[in-house]
Amino acid sequence: MLLGVNIDHVATLRQARGTRYPDPVKAALDAEEAGADGITVHLREDRRHIQERDVVLLKDVLQTRMNFEMGVTEEMMAFAEKIRPAHICLVPETRQELTTEGGLDVAGQEARIKAAVERLARTGAEVSLFIDADERQIEASRRVGAPAIELHTGRYADAETPTEVAEELQRIVEGVAFGVGHGLIVNAGHGLHYHNVEAVAAIKGINELNIGHALVAHALFVGFKAAVAEMKALIVAASR
């Protein structure tokens, strides 16, 4: 199972003071050295963390691959066509949210998403859709031509009781099986950390987990390379 390291919150810390540090590009290179299989960045409409310059620099220096998260807007579509990342993940986005709060409603806007997927695919990118583990959304993702999906694990991460955790984990298990059964590459992420990742990493059929906030938080105490290496070891062991 692959580990995609999201470096958005390295940029969050930088933007909090408007400084040039910490540098998310350095974090990305350190993550690669520590075993990351790819680097994920989300260029938001409000530019609250990652900036265009970060994406341009990362495209030039990464040894692995970039997973570029973006909202379905003309501005982002044009930027993605210019940058041409290896992977593009379409996500829902509102200015008021602290972080992405739910999956993209593909079923409710199939024509719009289909047009975006087709346009972005012409850049050579593998396009994925960030969706809830819901059969209706998974089927819609296949219909619009996306080769990959990323299942939103936030409800699992936020579950408080053992019963809720088990229910949300089962929802992910079923979503993965349904997606794989429909010929899709299935990734997952959101809210995963060192104490809840193993159960998800043990699910057969998941191609990649994308993790960011927990890594950046842990790196404050152990360093970025150590934080990434520790997470990678947990995922590899659980997915055997």
Curated annotation (Swiss-Prot):
Q: Which GO terms describe its biological process?
A: pyridoxine biosynthetic process
Where does it live in the cell? Answer: Cytoplasm
Instruction: Choose one Gene Ontology CC annotation of this protein and give it.
Output: cytosol
Q: Which residues bind 3-amino-2-oxopropyl phosphate?
A: 6, 17, 191, 212-213
Task: Name which cysteines form disulfide bonds.
Answer: none
According to its UniProt record, where is this protein mainly located? cytoplasm
Q: Which GO terms describe its molecular function?
A: pyridoxine 5'-phosphate synthase activity
Q: Where is this site: Transition state stabilizer?
A: 150
Specify the domain of life of the species encoding this protein: Bacteria
Q: In which pathway does it act?
A: Cofactor biosynthesis; pyridoxine 5'-phosphate biosynthesis; pyridoxine 5'-phosphate from D-erythrose 4-phosphate: step 5/5
Pfam families noted in UniProt: PdxJ (PF03740)
The record's EC number reads 2.6.99.2
Catalysed conversion reaction: 3-amino-2-oxopropyl phosphate + 1-deoxy-D-xylulose 5-phosphate = pyridoxine 5'-phosphate + phosphate + 2 H2O + H(+)
> What are the catalytic residues?
42 (proton acceptor), 69 (proton acceptor), 190 (proton donor)
UniProt-annotated binding residues for 1-deoxy-D-xylulose 5-phosphate: 8-9, 44, 49, 99
Q: Which UniProt keywords apply?
A: Cytoplasm, Pyridoxine biosynthesis, Transferase
Kindly state the subunit structure of this protein.
Answer: Homooctamer; tetramer of dimers.
Record's family? Belongs to the PNP synthase family.
State the protein's purpose: Catalyzes the complicated ring closure reaction between the two acyclic compounds 1-deoxy-D-xylulose-5-phosphate (DXP) and 3-amino-2-oxopropyl phosphate (1-amino-acetone-3-phosphate or AAP) to form pyridoxine 5'-phosphate (PNP) and inorganic phosphate.
NCBIfam families, from UniProt? pdxJ, PRK05265.1-1, PRK05265.1-3, PRK05265.1-5
Know the name of this protein? Pyridoxine 5'-phosphate synthase
State the organism named in the record: Pseudomonas putida (strain ATCC 700007 / DSM 6899 / JCM 31910 / BCRC 17059 / LMG 24140 / F1)
Gene symbol? Answer: pdxJ
